């Protein structure tokens, strides 16, 4: 089997970012390591939300007594999203995998380029401290919560206009019928 294309070793920078206005946002993960390499991984909103959930499950499994997400709290020294140099690698994520390297006591993240073979070796592999993962999970929760509100019945994003909701059997609410805000 071929080796991973980019082995980032242990990362010292791990951030999630949403760019743009709700409904028109793009999402990315930014990773950096001690060697000064940077990776920009473009990711869909559903993927970033699933990543946050998967991180929470992994950390709960590793530390059942410590279930709380780390609040984002004070910003890292560099503002989120600032890249001082062009990234070493940049691609759109097709699939992600999480794991745990028990020998090193570090979490593992593997990402496959959307254009690559999902059954082949990952495009990027890195090791992440549990505290970094917990912080990333908090960032992801913050990013996802700032998006468009969702319909409480069907879960679809609301755009501010009339909304067709299958569970409501096509009926509009009184406010939607009258154009009330």
Each predicted region: which residue ranges?
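Mixed-charge, glycine-accented linear interaction segment located at domain edges/termini
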Residues: 38, 111-166
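The feature marks the first
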Residues: 1-53, 57, 61
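Short, structured motif recognition centered on aromatic/hydrophobic residues
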Residues: 25-31, 51, 55, 107-111, ...
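Short cysteine/histidine-rich zinc-coordinating motifs and their immediately flanking basic loops
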Residues: 162-169, 177-180
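Intrinsic, low-complexity N-terminal interaction/targeting segments
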Residues: 1-27, 69-127
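N-terminal pre-domain and mature-chain start segments
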Residues: 38-42, 50, 57-78, 116-117, ...
């Amino acid at each position: 089997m071929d080796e991973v294309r980019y082995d980032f070793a242990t990362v010292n920078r791990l951030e999630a970012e949403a760019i743009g206005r709700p409904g028109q946002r793009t999402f990315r993960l930014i990773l950096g390591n001690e060697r000064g390499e940077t990776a920009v991984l473009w990711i869909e909103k559903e993927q970033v939300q699933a990543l946050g959930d998967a991180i929470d499950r992994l950390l709960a499994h590793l530390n059942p007594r410590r279930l709380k997400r780390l609040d984002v709290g004070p910003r890292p020294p560099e503002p989120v999203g600032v890249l001082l140099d062009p990234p070493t690698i940049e691609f759109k994520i097709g699939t992600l995998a999480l794991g745990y390297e028990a020998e090193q006591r570090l979490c593992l993240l593997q990402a496959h380029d959307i254009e690559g073979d999902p059954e082949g070796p990952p495009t990027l592999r890195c090791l992440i401290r549990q505290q970094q993962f917990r912080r990333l999970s908090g960032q992801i929760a913050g990013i996802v919560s700032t998006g468009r509100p969702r319909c409480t019945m069907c879960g679809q994003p609301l755009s501010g206009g009339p909304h067709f909701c299958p569970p409501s059997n096509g009926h509009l609410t009184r406010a939607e019928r009258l154009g009330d805000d």
